[in-house]
Amino acid sequence: MTLQCTKSAGHWKIVVWDEEGFQGRRHEFTAECPSVLELGFETVRSLKVLSGAWVGFEHAGFQGQQYVLERGEYPSWDAWSGNTAYPADRLTSFRPVACANHRDSRLTIFEQENFLGKKGELSDDYPSLQAMGWDGNEVGSFHVHSGAWVCSQFPGYRGFQYVLECDHHSGDYKHFREWGSHAQTFQVQSVRRIQQ
């Protein structure tokens, strides 16, 4: 069954199941889904991203921990939450990442909130910001010039994930509270571009 939701259909397609291993009831989406609970699912247990990049959320309404979902198969919840610091076995809402463009992505990171202090320009993946010369383990604010990025709490793309997009907040993320409802710290130690 293909469901059309509020955003216009693009080149995104995701199929979700209510049981692990691509078993049980399934639904196919080409646009955002604010709550699988409304479909009778308790949570998504497995999924396949057929096209586009998506971000999944722990709770309905695009709240809670964020999980980047790129093209591929995810037979169980640990396949998409394996590198997070506090894996949650719930995924109840998801949406496409419209501006993901791996080839043309640019991000400015700032030492302090509100775009103050030392800054760094990024256009590549960095498994360790400290290895590239960034002092400390915190980033105060971000400006996304183009593309979409996932920032991780720890080196090696581990820990909480924060999805930053050029078409959200006009690309401006002045404070960690704008990174997502689960963000509680400025700690960011690795950054990568989201693949379309």
Curated annotation (Swiss-Prot):
Molecular function GO terms recorded: structural constituent of eye lens
N-terminal arm as annotated region, ranges: 2-11
Cited InterPro entries: Beta/Gamma-Crystallin, Beta/gamma_crystallin, G_crystallin-like
Region annotation (Connecting peptide) ranges: 99-104
Location of the Beta/gamma crystallin 'Greek key' domain: 12-51, 52-98, 105-146, 147-195
GO biological process assignments: lens development in camera-type eye; visual perception
The protein's name in its UniProt record: Beta-crystallin A4
Oligomer status and interactors: Homo/heterodimer, or complexes of higher-order. The structure of beta-crystallin oligomers seems to be stabilized through interactions between the N-terminal arms.
Function: Crystallins are the dominant structural components of the vertebrate eye lens.
Stated family: Belongs to the beta/gamma-crystallin family.
Keyword line: Acetylation, Eye lens protein, Repeat
Organism (species): Canis lupus familiaris (Dog)
Domain commentary: Has a two-domain beta-structure, folded into four very similar Greek key motifs.
Modified residues (N-acetylthreonine): T2
